[in-house]
Amino acid sequence: LYDLGYREFMLADDIFTSDQKWATEVCDAIYKSKTKMIWTCTNGIRVESADDNLFKSLRRAGCYRVSFGFESGNDKVLKAFGKGGRATVEQARKAVKLARNAGIDANGYFMVGLSADTKDTMQDTIDFARTIPVDMIKCSISIAFPGTVMFDNYVKKGLIRSFDWDEYMIYTAKDLF
C-alpha cells in the first residue's frame, strides 16, 4: 500500500483486541513488515481488557490513535447496557492512561438515552466526558433498533412510537419513542 502512495490506514474491527494474543501478533507482523505507514484503531479496544503490553504493541506497530466505546459514565448503566458485564468507569480511566503512557492518542464514544439512563445518569456521562483526558469525543443518542434487547424492552413498555422500519435511521429529526 505504501508503494501505491498510501501513508495511513484505519483499522475498524469491533473485536480486534478481544483476543489480545492475536492482536499482538498482528501488531508484531505490521512492525516486522517495516511499513512506514501509520494507523489508527477506530474501535475494538475494550477497556476491561486493556493492558500496558497491548498499547506498547500497538504503538510499536505504528498505531497513533485508538478509540474507546465508553458509552456511559455510570457503572450501573454500563452493567445494564451489557458492556461485557465487566466494563467500569474506573477501567475506562485506566485504559486511557495506559494508551497515553504508550504515546497513543485516545478518542471516546458516548451514548445517552440508553434503556437504564435517567437524567442523573446522563449527567454522570456528561461529567465523565468532560473529565476523561481524550482528544475527541463523539456522543450519540441511542436508538432501539429492531432485534435488540433494548427494542424488545421498549415494546413491552409501550415506548415505541413507530414500527415503520424506514424511520430507523442513525440520524433522524423525528422522535422515535
Question: What positions do the PLM features span?
Answer:
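A structural motif corresponding to the C-terminal lobe/cap of the Radical SAM core domain
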Residues: 15-21, 25-177
